[in-house]
Amino acid sequence: MSKRTLEGTTRKQKRTSGFRARMRSVNGRKVIKARRKRGRYRLSV
């Protein structure tokens, strides 16, 4: 048996697509705004 290849890291995930990371840039804010408008239950990771 070979091991699974893609095993994600929570820290990396939070740093790239977490709420604080999104709020840091203008485009990230746009993402949050769009997700709010659409009524998403989860705005970010």
Swiss-Prot record:
Gene Ontology biological process terms in this record: translation
Keywords, comma-separated and alphabetical: Ribonucleoprotein, Ribosomal protein
Signal peptide bounds: none
Pfam families tied to this protein: Ribosomal_L34
The keyword Methyltransferase is annotated on this UniProt entry: no
GO cellular component terms attached to this protein's record: ribonucleoprotein complex; ribosome
GO molecular function, one term: structural constituent of ribosome
Cited HAMAP family: Ribosomal_bL34
Family: Belongs to the bacterial ribosomal protein bL34 family.
Identification of the protein by name: Large ribosomal subunit protein bL34
Lineage: Bacteria, Bacillati, Cyanobacteriota, Cyanophyceae, Oscillatoriophycideae
